[in-house]
Swiss-Prot record:
Protein name as annotated: Putative isochorismate synthase MenF
Entry keyword set: Isomerase, Magnesium, Menaquinone biosynthesis, Metal-binding
Lineage: Bacteria, Bacillati, Actinomycetota, Actinomycetes, Mycobacteriales
Superkingdom of the organism of origin: Bacteria
GO BP term, example: menaquinone biosynthetic process
Organism in which the protein naturally occurs: Mycobacterium tuberculosis (strain CDC 1551 / Oshkosh)
Length: 372
């Protein structure tokens, strides 16, 4: 926990917008890198609202804060919309051939007769450089304009300290991790995807193929089943549709399932729920421990990619989204790191999985003006 650190950038410390409105932080009163300390402040009333980002590995420092105040609005302010500086891909991390090798390693483990692993999400990254400092507000507005149904977000990561000081996470996630309003709980997990196409007939064919894909439906069901197990001790009257729905963004078709329920104990807060669910198999795997251990071995620290971004107020209400389709901007805003991943099961084709990550990169790279 530390005092507010001033920044030269005119960006807010936090913004989250979506179909139900926008929440923007004004200033920072207190910062927390320790999730448990932040939860304690919320429960004691010291923190009237808590907001920020959770890393993929919650044993790592978080980027949570208590703001001086918040602005709630229907949409984002009229932030700058001018052009961004030229952005280029400096490196692929790892190179595509190495990513294919990682998938092959995962498939061997998944196919093992007595192996514990059923699914693992493997990601790759691209390192980006800009000719001049990037404005995170411009990037966020571009993302939201491109997909108004997504959850656009911007988080100052200074609370996490060290290399994250001054950095910012900016993205537009299609995936709601969890929302709490009173005793009502809602989750909308995503797993299974296919690319969009400019030709309407091909686009419809891609959607239909996804909906009927045994591999993608299996991958999706693993996510839903795991979330059911996590939610049952916390919620009653769980409603989980038997079949997933199709959801589309500008670049990707997804399978998704809307899950609803009622809290068994009203003292369970939105951040409690987020921590109980994270990381879901949509970004980690099944079982969680085996999958996250393999991810750590093959990828190293993911940082805030595939974590969660959101807020929780003193009543326990809040929204948390999965931090995908994003980039972490460096403190000087002249560099960025973007990730994309895909769910690997025994039936996965490595080339298809590589192509899936390329498709998923499109959201953030298009907003940055990167030629693909």
């Amino acid at each position: 926990m530390s005092a507010h650190v001033a920044t030269l950038h005119p960006e807010p410390p936090f913004a989250l917008c979506g179909p139900r409105g926008t929440l923007i932080a004004r200033g920072v009163r207190t910062r927390y890198c320790d999730v448990r300390a932040a939860q304690a402040a919320l429960r004691s009333g010291t923190a009237p609202i808590l907001l920020g980002a959770l890393p993929f590995d919650v044993s790592r420092p978080a980027a949570l804060m208590v703001p001086d105040g918040v602005l709630r609005a229907r949409k984002l302010p009229d932030w700058p919309t001018g052009p961004l500086p030229k952005v280029r891909v400096a490196a692929a991390l790892p190179p595509p051939a190495d990513y294919l090798t990682r998938i092959g390693r995962a498939r061997d483990l998944l196919a093992a007769f007595d192996g514990p692993l059923h699914k693992v999400v493997l990601a790759r990254a691209v390192q980006l450089t800009a000719d001049a400092p990037l404005d995170a507000r411009v990037l966020l507005r571009r993302l939201v304009v491109a997909d108004p149904t997504a959850y656009g977000y911007l988080v100052d990561l200074t609370s996490a300290g060290n290399d994250d000081t001054g950095a910012a996470l900016v993205g537009a996630s299609p995936e709601l991790l969890v929302a709490r309003s009173g005793n009502r709980v809602m989750c909308k997990p995503f797993a299974g995807s296919a690319p969009r196409a400019a030709d309407p007939k091909l686009d419809a064919a891609n959607a239909a193929a996804l909906a009927s894909s045994a591999k993608n439906r299996h991958e999706h069901q693993l996510v839903v089943d795991t979330m059911r197990v996590a939610l049952e001790p916390l919620c009653e009257d769980l409603t989980i549709p038997a079949q997933p729905q199709l959801n589309r963004t500008a670049a990707v078709w997804h399978l998704c399932t809307a899950i609803t329920g009622r809290l068994r104990n009203i003292s369970t807060t939105a951040i409690d729920l987020a921590l109980a669910l994270h990381p879901t198999p949509a970004v980690g795997g099944v079982p969680t421990k085996a999958a996250t251990e393999l991810i750590a071995e093959l990828e190293g620290d993911r940082g805030f990619y595939a974590g969660a971004v959101g807020w929780c107020d003193g009543r326990g209400d809040g929204h948390w989204v999965v931090s995908i389709r994003c980039a972490q901007l460096s403190a000087d805003r002249r560099a960025a790191l973007a990730h994309a991943g895909g769910g690997i099961v025994a039936e996965s084709d490595p080339d298809d999985e590589l192509e899936e990550t390329t498709t998923k990169f499109a959201t953030i790279l298009t907003a940055l003006g990167v030629e693909q």
